[in-house]
From Swiss-Prot:
SUPFAM superfamilies: AF1104-like
Pfam family, one: ARMT1-like_dom
Protein's recorded name: Uncharacterized protein MJ0202
Coiled-coil regions listed: none
InterPro entries: ARMT-1-like_metal-bd_sf (IPR036075), ARMT1-like_metal-bd (IPR002791), PH1575-like (IPR014444)
Length: 304
C-alpha cells in the first residue's frame, strides 16, 4: 500500500491516544452513509482499520491521517462522495436560516458586528445540520452561538487588518458544506472594506468538506473568486495543492482559515508563512483545545 508521505515543518497538533476514537467513529459514520448493508459495513470498517494501524502514531498529524484513511475508504467502497446526501441536506437547512443569521448578526457597532459575523460562521460549524430533525430548535442553537463568546477574541486585530489599505487580497479557506452558507455572511462584511476575497474549497470530495458545488449553492462566486485546493486532502497540505492554489496562497495579504482541519495542517507551515493568519473554529476535541490553550467547546478567533 502506498501511503501519503509528507515533510512537515513546524510545531502543530499531533496525534494523541484519544484520536483513535475519533478516526474510528468517522469510519463507522462513513460506512453507514455508504451502505445500509451491515455485512458490507463490517467489511469496510475492518479493512480500513488495517490502514489506521499503519498511519496511527504519535508523530502523525490528524488531518494527514484522516486523509489517508478516508481516501482508502472511498477506494474500497467505490464511492467517491460518501457524504453527498448529508452535504445536500446541510446546505438545504442552512439556506433556510441564512437571512435570519444575517439579521441576528447585524448591529450598528462596527467591532461587535464583525465579532457576530465571525460567530455566525462558527454557528455553521457548531450545528451538524444533517443530524437534526424538525424536532430540534436549530434557530435557538444559532442564537445561542451568536450570543456566546469568543474565548480567544482577536476581533479588534481583524478589524484593524481589514482597515489596513496595504491588505488587499484575503484568502478565505472554507471548511464544511452547510457551514459555507454562513461563511457568506462574514465574506459580505469583509467586502465592505474593499477587499478582494479568494474563497477556497476542496478539489474533490472528502468527508463533508465543501466543494465547488457547495460554493455555487452558497453563491460564494457572487462575492469572491472561488478556487479549489486541487486535491481531496483534509485541511491544507501545500505539497498536494494545485499551482492555482499555491499562487493565490503566495499572493494573498491575509489568510482566514475555518475549522480544526485547517488549523491542524496550516500550523505545520507557520514558520514559513510571512502573512497574518486568522483561525476561526470551535475547539471540539482535547488535542486541538490544548494546543490552542482553551477548553473543549470554546469558540476561537485566533491571529497567528
Amino acid at each position: 500500500m502506498v501511503l501519503l508521505i509528507l515533510k512537515f515543518h513546524g510545531e502543530s497538533v499531533k496525534i494523541k491516544p484519544e484520536c483513535a476514537i475519533c478516526i474510528i467513529r468517522q469510519v463507522v459514520d462513513a460506512a453507514n452513509e455508504i451502505t445500509d448493508d451491515e455485512r458490507e459495513q463490517f467489511r469496510l470498517i475492518k479493512s480500513t482499520m488495517e490502514v489506521i494501524k499503519d498511519v496511527y502514531g504519535e508523530s502523525a498529524v490528524p488531518a494527514w491521517m484522516g486523509t489517508v484513511v478516508h481516501r482508502y475508504l472511498k477506494k474500497i467502497s467505490n464511492n467517491n462522495d460518501p457524504y453527498k446526501n448529508l452535504k445536500e441536506k446541510a446546505n438545504k437547512i442552512a439556506l433556510q436560516y441564512l437571512d435570519k443569521v444575517r439579521e441576528m448578526s447585524n448591529t450598528d457597532d462596527e467591532l461587535e458586528r464583525l465579532r457576530k459575523k465571525v460567530l455566525a460562521t462558527i454557528a455553521g460549524n457548531v450545528i451538524d445540520f444533517g443530524a437534526y430533525s424538525t424536532g430540534i430548535n436549530i434557530e435557538k442553537l444559532i442564537e445561542d452561538t451568536l450570543n456566546g463568546e469568543l474565548k480567544i477574541d482577536n476581533s479588534r486585530k481583524l478589524l484593524n487588518d481589514l482597515k489596513d489599505k496595504n491588505i488587499k487580497k484575503i484568502l478565505y479557506i472554507c471548511d464544511n458544506a452547510g457551514e459555507i452558507i454562513f461563511d457568506r455572511v462574514l465574506m459580505e462584511e469583509i467586502k465592505k472594506y474593499d477587499k478582494d476575497i479568494v474563497a477556497v474549497v476542496k478539489g474533490k470530495p472528502i468527508l463533508n468538506d465543501a466543494t465547488l458545488e457547495d460554493a455555487k449553492i452558497a453563491k460564494i462566486d457572487e462575492i469572491a473568486k472561488v478556487i479549489t485546493t486541487g486535491s481531496d486532502i483534509i485541511g491544507i497540505i501545500l505539497e498536494e495543492c494545485s499551482e492555482e492554489f499555491l499562487k493565490e496562497f503566495e499572493s494573498a495579504d491575509l489568510i482566514i482559515a475555518k475549522g480544526m482541519g485547517n488549523y491542524e495542517s496550516l500550523t505545520e507551515y507557520e514558520d514559513k508563512i510571512d502573512k497574518p493568519i486568522y483561525y476561526i473554529l470551535k475547539a471540539k476535541c482535547k488535542p486541538v483545545a490544548e494546543n490552542i490553550g482553551v477548553d473543549v467547546g470554546d469558540n476561537v478567533l485566533l491571529k497567528r
